[in-house]
Amino acid sequence: MTPQRYNLYGQGGSGKSYIGTSAIIDHETDELLAPKGLWIQIGQERNPNLHVPEANIKRFNVDVLQPHACITGVIDFLKGLQVAAAKGQVADVIFFDGYTELDILIGYVHDMQPLENDKWSEWRYRKTIMTAVTQILDSAVLGCDIITTARVGQLKKGVTDRRTGETTGADPDFVNSRYFPQMDGWMRYNLPSYHDWCFYLEAEDSINGAIHRMHLVQDGDFFIKNGLSHRWKKPLPNHLDSATFQQLKQVIDHAGKPIIQKEKEGVSK
């Protein structure tokens, strides 16, 4: 498969970081699968229990003395990856963790040190940074798979004025999923456009312990972006439980094969 962009979204503990880092390290053996794999941690996104080597981690945290330095640092670092890729120095995989935390960080930083004295300053700043990040995190340019995360947001129904009947604060009518990646401002409706795949994760209980379920096809409650939905026929699964990134790619690779060939072969185990 050519390098592609994957967005994984869900609440905390749904398994986003586990799947993202499984592209870098085997979580059962701690074997390093991607020596040049990179886990970019934004703000408070981190998990030392996943045993990813420090050499494969890049962190961006707020310095209260220079609040905007962490934001500009993210952009400069990503630009550096772009320059390196142009010279043939390509990462094995990039795991950007994650968009919602960056969104929160932008607001936090702007509150500490506003850039302009008007009410729209934060939103212009937010749009500028988010646009830059989504444009630079291009798998075709960087030459590797890019995995990103976001937390889960819920459809806003708004508040209706009893006197006028007017509803304010609601999501527009084209938002027809109850759950989707959690963002603010312009990016709230645009994040999935910058990914080839967008999958929803949730944690479920079972008699054998917690299951981290990744939904692969749309069912109405949660937003899914699946570019091969027109080829998604049995025995392809509607979801994967406690899967690794490699297992996800196997299913997607199988979905990309001609339908007649798939029926003969079945899904790879």
Locate each region found by the language model.
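P-loop NTPase motor core
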Residues: 93-189
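Generic domain-boundary/flexible-linker signal
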Residues: 48-50, 105, 157-158, 209
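Phosphate-binding/switch region of NTP-binding enzymes
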Residues: 9-13, 146-235
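Residues immediately flanking
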Residues: 42, 98, 203
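C-terminal regions of RecA-like/P-loop NTPase motor modules
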Residues: 1-4, 207-269
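Conserved P-loop
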Residues: 1-93, 101
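Structured loop/turn residues at beta-strand edges in well-structured enzyme cores
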Residues: 89, 142, 193
